[in-house]
């Protein structure tokens, strides 16, 4: 996992050396509304609100197409109710999406692509009891990201909305399949877009 994250970070930061005139770097942040979906229908599953913050690179491939790799710290989770007990799962990931964008002249961008996520923290809360549950989850999650963004012309500022769908089972020890899915909304700033 550390090797894959290192390769992703090196590739992310080396994009500027390849075609500096077509690459922009930026920062982003915002809110998450996520839940961990599973096939155990006896659990009442409700979403959890979290946040995300990270860096992005915007690489123009052609007049209307761009590639946008990102490295983003993201907090997600789920609330489960089983009988009288309620348990909250809080998970933190480093997400590395690589999005292909179609850019309209008015600043609107449609985007989609694969995402790999690396688990960095996992805790559960049931009443006053807090537990480290990282060993219960797989360290990597593979999924798809799709959404839209809007870059305000001549400012570098933009808005982003995205749906992330986990495709792999993140539950390491359970008898049921669990996948992450959720919405992200946020803002970003590209440094050399003015």
Task: Annotate each predicted stretch with a short phrase.
Residues 80-112:
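Helix-adjacent hinge/juxtasegments
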Residues 21-23, 45-51, 90-94, 138-144, ...:
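Residues that define the transmembrane beta-barrel architecture of outer-membrane proteins
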Residues 1-28, 187, 191:
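Bacterial Sec-dependent N-terminal signal peptides
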Residues 27-31, 51-59, 71-73, 96-102, ...:
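Residues on the lipid-exposed face of transmembrane beta-strands in outer-membrane beta-barrel proteins
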Residues 36-45, 75-93, 119-140, 169-176:
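Flexible, solvent-exposed loop segments that connect beta-strands
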């Amino acid at each position: 996992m550390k090797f894959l994250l290192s390769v992703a970070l090196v590739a992310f930061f080396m994009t500027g050396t390849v075609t500096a005139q077509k690459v922009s770097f930026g920062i982003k942040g915002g809110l998450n509304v996520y839940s961990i979906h599973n096939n155990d229908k006896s659990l009442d599953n409700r979403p959890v609100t979290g946040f995300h913050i990270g860096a992005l690179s915007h690489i123009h491939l052609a007049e209307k197409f761009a590639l946008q790799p990102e490295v983003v710290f993201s907090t997600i989770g789920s609330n489960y109710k089983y009988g009288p007990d309620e348990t909250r799962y809080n998970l933190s990931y480093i997400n590395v999406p690589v999005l292909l964008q179609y850019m309209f002249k008015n600043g609107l961008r449609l985007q989609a692509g694969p995402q790999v996520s690396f688990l960095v923290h996992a805790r559960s809360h049931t009443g006053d009891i807090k537990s480290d549950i990282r060993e219960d989850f797989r360290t990597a999650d593979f999924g798809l990201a799709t959404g839209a963004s809007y870059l305000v012309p001549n400012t570098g500022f933009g808005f982003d909305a995205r749906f992330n769908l986990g495709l792999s089972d993140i539950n390491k020890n359970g008898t049921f399949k669990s996948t992450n899915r959720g919405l992200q909304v946020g803002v970003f700033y590209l440094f050399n877009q003015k």
